[in-house]
Regions:
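Active-site substrate-recognition segment that forms the wall
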Residues: 84, 124-132, 218-220, 235-378
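Glycine-rich FAD pyrophosphate-binding loop
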Residues: 59-79
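Helix-loop-beta segment of a Rossmann-like dinucleotide-binding subdomain
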Residues: 30, 128-138, 170-204, 208, ...
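Dinucleotide-binding Rossmann-like beta1-alpha1 core, especially the glycine-rich loop
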Residues: 87-168
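Extreme N-terminal leader/targeting segments of oxidoreductases
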Residues: 1-41
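Helical element adjacent to the flavin cofactor pocket in flavoenzyme catalytic cores
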Residues: 147, 151-157, 179-240
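N-terminal Rossmann-like FAD-binding beta1-loop-alpha1 element of flavoenzymes
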Residues: 39-66
Length: 448
């Protein structure tokens, strides 16, 4: 790998008006890519997945260069709610095995350990990200859905996950609310300040010897003479292997970089909101042990505490006409329904970001989507489709992507490789997605 030489001064990146941008420690000072560089592995995207890949490559002794359009954590990695959840949005382990056989079993093991992987990495490198491994709770929003909790506890317990079934009284005591009908608790989950974590990952990657270039949007990707070349406005990186780790923001590249990937992933806008600091007397009655919480509503009911007594929640990713002003009142009313003791709710921070959804999760909301690792060509890989569960998963997938570049056998990977499936009607799906909320509400109201 050639030495980093970027020195250009460019306009600073504009950050969203988020709680995380206001509270995260500064990230590392990074150069712009100028000139032609070489590396063993080129990584496009400095979010959780790209940075995790770089860290795992450097721990293998492999040269890694990361190219980022803005700054580490600028995209979804630094904008999300920060919940560390070691499951998919709806699938149980048996569904993964039905779809992928032995590869599904390997993925289940990867997913089972994903939250612990994240917290272990944070502890190992001393990343200051307000990490709290207090567990993740999924309460059920109707009596009939208690059998979902029973099934999930049974299936996850069978593969060694530390999960516990909670009856209605236990959920009420744990969360400080009597609106739910039971649920289950995974002790390995929790929450982080996601932007602080992304910046911490960048620091770790640099200390391990990776190169990271910021404010350097990729403008083309090509392959010749058994090498991949990623070009930016002022330079290029040529490498034996390529990782495209842009997920929901792949669409920004459209036809220029990976058109099949850009036409497959569906970026859906998701809103996050942080209340004003809540008094200790009230805070100790709402999720007193500070677990991360997201229930069984498809409309997305979720909440967690930050380090400053702010309750961090959000609105549905598919709220027609969604905007910061439009969401304040309905989300405030929701919090008051869940926790009447909270009183009047005011939000200090409201921000948004894109979630990478797979088409199956949008076109068939009763059948949640699977994440995918695609092979772009020899030694070229991409992943898409977090479907709202990328925080924990992306760290473990970074390890798997690092392994793919070093010739790991397909039958050992935690997620099977697949070919991209560009969607001919992607533009239509993107336009109608914001209006799926009425359907989601009907599905939520239907007892099972």
């Amino acid at each position: 790998m050639t030495a980093s030489s970027g020195t250009s001064v460019t306009p600073s990146v504009t950050w969203p008006p988020s709680l995380w941008a206001a509270t995260a420690p500064p990230g590392p000072a990074l150069p712009v890519l100028e000139g032609d560089e070489t590396s063993d592995v080129a990584i496009v995207g400095a979010g959780f997945t790209g940075l995790s890949t770089a860290i795992h490559l450097r721990e293998m002794g492999v040269a890694a260069t990361v190219i980022e359009a803005a700054e580490p954590g600028w995209g979804a990695s630094g904008r999300n709610n920060g919940q560390v959840i070691p499951t998919l949005a709806g699938h149980d382990p048996s569904a993964m095995v039905r779809r992928h056989g032995e590869a599904g079993e390997r993925f289940n093991a990867l997913l089972r350990d994903s939250a612990s992987d994240l917290f272990d990495l944070a502890r190992r490198f001393g990343i200051a990200a307000e990490a709290e491994q207090a567990g993740w709770v999924q309460p059920v929003h109707s009596p009939g859905r208690f059998k979902l909790a029973e099934r999930r506890v049974k299936e996850w317990s069978a593969i060694g996950a530390p999960v516990e079934l909670l009856d209605r009284a236990a959920v009420s005591a744990m969360l400080g609310s009597d609106v739910w009908f039971g649920g289950f608790w995974n002790r390995t989950g929790g929450h982080i300040n996601p932007l602080a974590f992304a910046r911490g990952l960048a620091d770790v990657a640099l200390k391990l010897g990776a190169a990271i270039y910021a404010r350097s949007p990729a403008v083309s990707i090509s392959r010749a003479n058994d090498r991949w070349t990623v070009k930016t406005a002022h330079g290029s990186v040529t490498a034996r292997a390529l990782i495209l780790a842009t997920n929901a923001y792949t669409g920004e590249f459209e036809q220029q970089l990976a058109p099949d990937i850009a036409r497959e992933v569906i970026p859906v806008l998701s809103w996050q909101m942080a209340t004003k600091p809540i008094s200790n007397n009230i805070a100790k009655t709402i999720i007193p042990d500070r677990q991360a919480v997201s229930d069984t509503h498809r409309e997305l009911y979720f909440a967690r505490w930050d380090a400053r007594n702010r309750l961090v929640t959000g609105g549905a990713a598919m709220w027609p006409g969604a905007g910061g002003v439009n969401l304040r009142e309905p989300v405030a009313e929701r919090l008051k329904r869940l926790w009447p003791q909270i009183g009047d709710v005011e939000f200090d921070y409201v921000w948004s970001g894109y979630v990478g959804m797979t088409p199956d999760s949008l076109l068939h909301p009763e059948v949640p989507g699977f994440p995918r690792i695609h092979q772009l060509g020899p030694n070229g890989f991409a992943w898409i489709g977090c479907n709202g569960r990328a925080v924990a998963l992306s760290i473990s997938l970074g390890r798997e992507l690092a392994r793919t570049t070093q010739g790991a056998a397909i039958e050992t990977l935690g997620l099977p490789l697949s070919e991209p499936r560009p969607q001919p009607f992607q533009s239509i799906v993107r336009k109608v997605a914001p209006f799926a909320l009425p359907l989601y509400r009907r599905l939520d109201a239907k007892e099972i």
